[in-house]
């Protein structure tokens, strides 16, 4: 058994692991990366964010082609199978792997591919694919192993008609009707994707509102859009059992209802990838969802072991995971890069997409903050009209006395890009965070960004 010594060992090469490894390496530390795959990138690159967003992009292009009057004049709408559309995602994955492998090489991070587990608080043993065991001894270890779909024990996920958000990428046909159980971010995103391919979607939600953490007006806009696009949303429902058939699936609900479809996609929750890490050897406890607890420095109860990304739970976003990993390494190398990551914009890649940052109306009302609202509807924006994307709006919440921007919520074309302008202003100190910035700034025309000026004027007009 070969033994290697490092300053920092990172478990997992997803966004959190990459952020941690790069920060530690750039600070001059000797770093090793361990990943169970033979390629870097983690679930984000291979099964999650990258393939699903590439898939969404292709589906959106198909939808634009089929709804554009100019193209419709040429011929009938074109429909593509799910496997055909998925091929575009596979190309992006290989490009991402190549890019990220280069990052590690340039920063002299050693890569170990195999199953890593703790022998003790400073030792990780890696069982490689060829059976060779490598021992990595480190001063500090960062757990960034990510998460996987939560699988209830009473559901047969080996059945050829039952999928989760990882295995759905192996779907070899296009179902006529699909049940999606779980209307969280992943469930809503896949509902949009399959609806865009002409699939009838039954979206089963165990809550009374879609994505209840969003501003209620944005959530309602998404619900309305879904209802117009072959997506039936069933709220306040819980599964009793899932019955797999040769030609489909029947979902039995506790309410007594039954839904039959060609396939079922399970999107109800995530589980941290900690079960194979040998956590009992280091005294770090995990909760019922396999997640570990960390403090504001991303340190666990063991002083030299840290955690970042999906494995620590909220907010379970790739963007946040990268910053959490970078901050965990910052706590170790003490180079001024640490920060507690809590000001993260939410990006939801439904069709149209959603993004927000800051407080929503419910939160501000509950806190008794005197706020006002400014709105810009995309149907009136020149750029949205040119792009043929009239659905959506930008909504700014601001303090009616100080004009401080308190929240930005966007639904529609380029929402995940638009939100960053509001994020930049909200991060400014003191009086520099003001709604007047949007009034006094010249925006390129025509752009989606100028929606900020329209919304700002709308908000100011409400004051008296």
From Swiss-Prot:
Domain of life of the source: Bacteria
Binding site for FAD: 35-44
Pfam family, one: Pyr_redox_2
Enzyme Commission code(s) on record: 1.6.1.1
UniProt remark on cofactor binding: Binds 1 FAD per subunit.
Catalysed reactions, semicolon-separated: NAD(+) + NADPH = NADH + NADP(+)
Sorted UniProt keywords: Cytoplasm, FAD, Flavoprotein, NAD, NADP, Oxidoreductase
Entry GO MF terms: dihydrolipoyl dehydrogenase (NADH) activity; flavin adenine dinucleotide binding; NAD(P)+ transhydrogenase (Si-specific) activity
GO cellular component: cytosol
One BP annotation, GO: 2-oxoglutarate metabolic process
Cofactor: FAD
Subcellular location: Cytoplasm
NCBIfam families: PRK05249.1
Protein role: Conversion of NADPH, generated by peripheral catabolic pathways, to NADH, which can enter the respiratory chain for energy generation.
Family statement: Belongs to the class-I pyridine nucleotide-disulfide oxidoreductase family.
Name used for this protein in its record: Soluble pyridine nucleotide transhydrogenase
Source organism of the structure: Pseudomonas fluorescens (strain SBW25)
């Amino acid at each position: 058994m070969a033994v290697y010594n490092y300053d920092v060992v990172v478990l997992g090469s997803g966004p959190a692991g990459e952020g941690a490894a790069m920060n530690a390496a750039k600070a001059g530390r000797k770093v090793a990366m361990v990943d169970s795959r033979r390629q870097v990138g983690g679930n984000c690159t291979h099964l999650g964010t990258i393939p699903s967003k590439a898939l969404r992009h292709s589906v959106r292009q198909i939808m634009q082609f089929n709804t554009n009057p100019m193209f419709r004049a040429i011929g009938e709408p074109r429909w593509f199978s799910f496997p055909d559309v998925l091929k575009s995602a596979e190309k992006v994955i290989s490009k991402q792997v190549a890019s990220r492998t280069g990052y590690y090489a340039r920063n002299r991070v050693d890569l170990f591919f195999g199953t890593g587990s703790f022998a003790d608080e400073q030792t990780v043993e890696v069982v490689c694919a060829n059976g060779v065991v490598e021992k990595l001894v480190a001063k500090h270890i960062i757990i960034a192993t990510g998460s996987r779909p939560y699988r209830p024990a009473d559901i047969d996920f080996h059945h050829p008609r039952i999928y989760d958000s990882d295995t759905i990428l192996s779907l070899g046909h296009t179902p006529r009707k699909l049940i999606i159980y779980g209307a969280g971010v992943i469930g809503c995103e896949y509902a949009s994707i399959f609806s865009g391919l002409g699939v009838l979607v039954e979206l089963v939600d165990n809550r009374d509102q879609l994505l209840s953490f969003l501003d209620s007006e944005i959530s309602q806009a998404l619900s309305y859009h879904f209802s117009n696009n072959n997506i039936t949303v069933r709220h306040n429902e819980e599964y009793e059992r899932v019955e797999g058939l040769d030609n489909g699936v029947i979902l039995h609900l506790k309410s007594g209802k039954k839904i039959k479809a060609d396939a079922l996609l399970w999107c109800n929750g995530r589980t941290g990838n900690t079960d194979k890490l040998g956590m009992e050897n280091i005294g770090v406890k995990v909760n019922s969802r396999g997640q570990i607890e960390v403090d504001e420095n991303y340190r666990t109860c063991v002083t030299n072991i840290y955690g970042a990304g999906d494995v620590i739970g909220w907010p379970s976003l790739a963007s946040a995971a990268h910053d959490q990993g970078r901050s965990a390494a910052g706590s170790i190398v003490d180079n001024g890069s640490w920060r507690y990551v809590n000001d993260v914009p939410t990006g939801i890649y439904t069709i149209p997409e959603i993004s927000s940052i800051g407080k929503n109306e419910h939160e501000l009302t509950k806190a008794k903050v005197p706020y006002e609202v400014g709105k810009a509807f995309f149907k009136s924006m020149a750029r949205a009209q040119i792009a043929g994307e009239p659905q959506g709006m930008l909504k700014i919440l601001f303090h009616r006395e100080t004009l401080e921007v308190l929240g930005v919520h966007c639904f529609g074309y380029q929402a995940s890009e638009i939100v960053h302008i509001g994020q930049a202003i909200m991060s400014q100190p003191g009086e520099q965070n003001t709604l007047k910035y949007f009034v006094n700034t010249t925006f390129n025309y025509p752009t989606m960004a100028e929606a900020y000026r329209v919304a700002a004027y709308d908000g100011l007009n409400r004051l008296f």
